[in-house]
From Swiss-Prot:
InterPro entries: DXP_reductoisomerase (IPR003821), DXP_reductoisomerase_C (IPR013644), DXP_reductoisomerase_N (IPR013512), DXPR_C (IPR026877), DXPR_C_sf (IPR036169), NAD(P)-bd_dom_sf (IPR036291). It holds the Pfam family DXPR_C. Pathway: Isoprenoid biosynthesis; isopentenyl diphosphate biosynthesis via DXP pathway; isopentenyl diphosphate from 1-deoxy-D-xylulose 5-phosphate: step 1/6. The keyword NADP applies. Belongs to the DXR family. This is 1-deoxy-D-xylulose 5-phosphate reductoisomerase. 1-deoxy-D-xylulose 5-phosphate binds at K124, S150, E151, S185, H208, S221, N226, K227, E230. Keywords: Isoprene biosynthesis, Manganese, Metal-binding, NADP, Oxidoreductase. Catalyzes the NADPH-dependent rearrangement and reduction of 1-deoxy-D-xylulose-5-phosphate (DXP) to 2-C-methyl-D-erythritol 4-phosphate (MEP).
Amino acid sequence: MQNMVILGATGSIGASTLSVISANPDAYRVYALVANASVDKMLALCITHRPQVAHMVDSQAALALQAKLPPELNIQVSSGEDELIALVTATEVDTVMAAIVGAAGLVPTLAAVKAGKRVLLANKEALVMSGELFIEATKASGATLLPVDSEHNAIFQCLPEEVQANLGRCDLAASGISHILLTGSGGPFLTAELASLAAMTPAQACKHPNWSMGPKISVDSATMMNKGLEFIEARWLFNTQNDQLKVVIHPQSVIHSMVQYRDGSVIAQMGNPDMRTPIAHCMSYPQRISSGVEPLDFFKVGQLSFCEPDFNRFPCLALAIAACAQGQEATTVLNAANEIAVEAFLQGQIGFTHIAKVNEACLSSVPKRAMTSIDDIIALDAQTRIYAREQLAKLA
C-alpha cells in the first residue's frame, strides 16, 4: 500500500489521479490532499477520499475548510509553506503527485525530491525554473522521478531501460537515439486565420479540441507555450541537446510522442487522450495497473496527420526554444512572464496576441543573473513578474 500526497488535488490532474486511486484501492491510499483555495471542492474530496491531512495554501481557506469538515472524519487541516514541506517530506509518505500549476509548485516539489520520495512530476514549471538544481537534487537524494506529462511519459515509455533509470543524466547517443519527437496538437487555433488571433477570447482559447485541462494550461496550449515548456522540460529530463529535440504538430493527439533511433526505427506511444493513462503508468511503474481508460480502437482512429510548427502562428513556442538554448536564467524569466501574461488574458486585461509580446519583452529586458540556489531562482522569478506587470500597464 502506497501512501500518496496529491499536490493540486482540486485541479484536473488531481481529479484524474484520484480516479486511478479509486480504481486500485488495494494498492494506494490518499494520505494528504493539497489545494490552494477551493474550499468546497476540497471538502467534497475529503468526504470521498478520507485523507489524513487536508492542506490549503490559503490560510483563510484552511479556516473555512476546518469549519465545514465533519469532525467525525478526523482530518487534520493545515496551512503554510513550512507545514506543506513537512507534509511532503513526512516518513509516512511514499509518493508525491506534483500537480500544482506554475511556479507555486516548485518549493514543495523540490522538497519531496530532496527527501528521496517517489515524485510523479506533472508540474513542468519546476524543471523549467530550476533545471540543473532539480536534477542534481534528484541524484543526491536518490529520489525516483517519473514524468506525468503525456508527452514526456510517452517518451519515457519509448526509451531503453538504461535511459529510464538515469533521467537527467542519460546519454541518448550512447543508447542509439538520434532524436526525440515531441508531439503537440496545435491547440484550438491551429487552422484559424492569423488575422483573427488578436480577437480570440479566453473561452475560445480554453476550448481544446482533444484534452480536458485547466484554464492556464489550456491557454498555454493555444499559444503552444505549453509545448515550449515541455521542450525545456524534455531537455532536462532526457539530458538532450537542442538539436536532439524536434516538435511535431499532430492534431489528433493519438501519438503522444516518439523516439527516433540511429538505425531508422521510430518507437511511438499511442493511446486515447486521457491523463489517467500516464498517471497510472507513473503510479505503478515498472508494473501496470488499470487506469479506467478505454483502449485505442484502431478501426475508429481514422487518419493521423503531421506537420511542422508555424512560428508565425506560435511565437511563444519559438521564444521557448530560444530560451532553452540560452540557459536556465532565460527559461526562468520566460516562465514567470508567461504566468503573468496568461492570467491577465484570462481576466480580460490583454488580448491573446499580447501574451507573446509580454513574454518577448521580459526575455529581452530583464537582467539575467547567475542562479546557484533556489533563492536565486525565486528572486529572478519575482523580478520578472514585476517587469511583466509593468508591460501589462503599457498594453492596457
